[in-house]
């Protein structure tokens, strides 16, 4: 799980790293920690990731506040038996990224003089990077960044009634935007 700290009387759990579906883990395993955090009393989840930049008006190295995500092409992490102690069978997903927390992030960025992009995270389960055609499709569908994590955890957090705030480091330009191949090294350098 990670470490637990106390900050202003509140307990804060910090997780380092995550399991990914592309590593062979089931969605139940990928999202297990979110449910454990909820059972421990956590009511807010802050998620971060590094992802490819799909929006051609932006550049690698910028920070994006996640306003929503697209996860259409793989099964749901809620598939299977519903656990009513966490939430209803068919939860609403219209505000998974809590508007109030997004406003707090905007206010903080403004006070610090930081550029904070706002956009939609497009989930692909990998492990291969996306093709240029897939990136064009992601852009047409409204994606601003593309990555291989975050959406499953956020769906489960929403199911559990947790508030969510998400940030993406735009680590590289996505496939086909620049005339160069993608590499894991450029993602690791940025992140």
Model-derived regions, located:
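Phosphate/pyrophosphate-binding betaalpha-module
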Residues: 51-111
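His/Asp/Glu-rich mid-to-C-terminal helical/loop segments that flank catalytic regions of hydrolases
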Residues: 175-191
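Short, small-residue-biased leader/transition segments that mark boundaries at the very start
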Residues: 2-5
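Flexible, glycine/proline-enriched loop segments at strand-loop-helix junctions
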Residues: 16-27, 34, 86-96
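General beta-strand structural signal in soluble alpha/beta enzymes
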Residues: 14-16, 45-49, 65, 116-122, ...
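Active-site/ligand-binding-proximal alpha/beta "capping" segment
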Residues: 108-144
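A C-terminal functional module that forms or caps the active site or interfaces directly
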Residues: 129-174
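Short, basic, glycine/proline-bearing loop/turn elements
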Residues: 11-25, 120, 139-140
């Amino acid at each position: 799980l990670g470490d637990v700290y106390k900050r202003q009387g509140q307990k804060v759990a910090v997780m380092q790293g995550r399991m990914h579906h592309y590593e062979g883990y089931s969605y139940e395993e990928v999202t297990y920690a979110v449910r454990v955090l909820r059972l421990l009393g956590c009511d807010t989840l802050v998620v971060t990731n590094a992802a490819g930049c799909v929006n051609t008006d932006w550049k690698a190295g910028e920070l994006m506040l996640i306003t929503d995500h697209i996860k259409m092409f793989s099964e749901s992490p809620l598939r299977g038996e519903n656990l009513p102690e966490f939430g209803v069978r068919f939860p609403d997903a219209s505000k998974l990224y809590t508007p109030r927390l997004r406003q707090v992030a905007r206010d903080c960025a403004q006070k610090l003089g930081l550029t904070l992009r706002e956009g939609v995270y497009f989930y692909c389960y990998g492990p291969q990077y996306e093709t240029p055609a897939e990136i064009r499709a992601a852009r047409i569908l409204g994606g601003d960044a593309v990555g291989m994590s975050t959406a499953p955890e956020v769906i489960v957090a929403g199911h559990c009634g947790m508030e969510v705030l998400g940030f993406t480091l735009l680590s590289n330009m996505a496939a086909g935007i620049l005339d160069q191949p993608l590499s894991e090294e450029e993602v690791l350098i940025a992140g």
